[in-house]
Design a protein with these regions (language model features):
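S-adenosyl-L-methionine
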Residues: 162-164
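Transmembrane beta-barrel domains of bacterial outer-membrane proteins
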Residues: 1-122, 126-130, 137-150, 166-184
Length: 184
């Protein structure tokens, strides 16, 4: 096997380090500007000109008077496979009075900025320190459209459900079971 060009490897490493530093600085600046905010920014594949990025922000709003419920907003902007997708969602999470269980509900809207596809979803979650269950239902809001390479495409309806459980005596190890179905 051929070895990589050391100059190219050095340049790639420098670009990746600079990108990571700038991404972290931008995320920190956003979080300092927006109270109760957590932002993640990821940029990859710059060297092969198929750049992918993901910007996600979760902002928590005021707690309920008893401190056991909180509303949140999640926004994201993703670019992969020559598609840019915007996502916005709102939810509410509830903590049990004994603080052992968290439940939540959410609603999201997805928009493909390149081709105009739209989808809405609703979901729920139930989590403890040892087990978690999430379920989401997705509904297409747009019909068939001309998409990438002029192919006809459309958003699918569907659902997903995931169960995760911590494996006893193996801290930090969780086993997940996931099922999904898409139709349309």
């Amino acid at each position: 096997a051929e070895s990589e060009d050391p100059g190219k490897t050095l340049l790639t490493d420098a670009v990746n380090d600079a990108t990571s530093t700038l991404s972290n600085s931008a995320a920190n600046a956003i979080d300092k500007t927006i109270p109760n905010s957590r932002t993640d920014i990821s940029i990859t594949s710059i060297d092969n000109r198929k750049t992918r990025y993901n910007i996600r922000n979760v902002t928590g709003f005021a707690m309920s008077s008893d401190g056991l419920a909180r509303n949140f907003m999640q926004t994201s902007l993703n670019n992969a496979n020559s598609r840019t997708v915007l996502n916005i969602g709102f939810g509410r999470r509830f903590l049990s009075s004994d603080e052992k269980w968290m439940t939540g509900i959410n609603a999201f809207f997805d928009y493909d900025a390149d081709y105009g596809h739209q989808r809405a979803s609703i979901g729920g979650e139930l989590k403890s320190s040892a087990i978690g269950l999430t379920a989401n239902s997705y509904q297409a809001l747009t019909e068939w459209k001309s998409g990438k390479d002029s192919n006809q495409e459309h958003v699918l309806d569907g659902y997903d459900i995931e169960l995760g459980a911590q494996i006893p005596y193996m801290p930090g190890t969780t086993l997940f079971l996931k099922s999904w179905k898409w139709s349309g």
